[in-house]
Amino acid sequence: MIVLDTNVISELMRAQPSPSVVSWVDRQLDSTLYLTVLTLAEIRFGIAALPKGRRRMALTRAFEDGIRPLFSDRILDFDEQASIEYAELRANARRRGVALSDADALIGAIVRTHRCKIATRDEGPFKAAGL
């Protein structure tokens, strides 16, 4: 299982996504790729924050009709076990003086709960969290 971080999905939604990201995703088995509910929320927020217009509508369609359905049965929730993992991740990061955002800690907690890997374009926070 590999969780795709929000920045990977954002990259795939660009008009001209990074060839290396597209190539990497294409080499993976679809059944091994997952999203978290946090990524859904972050993508939807990013789109909702745009001014109303064609770009916002196009991104909404691209996500809701294109990307989102591809993961319909592969979306991981934040549950009670993830809340335990979240608390540990944040506490350990604080003790070490490492910055770990709420969003990264929430996604990291889901990753830990399901014992999977994370694919991200920003490895720093996740490496610092021991993922």
What would you call each of these model-derived segments?
Residues 1, 32, 103-104, 123:
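A short, glycine- and basic residue-enriched loop/turn
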Residues 1-39, 47-66:
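Short, well-structured N-terminal submotif of metal-dependent ribonuclease cores
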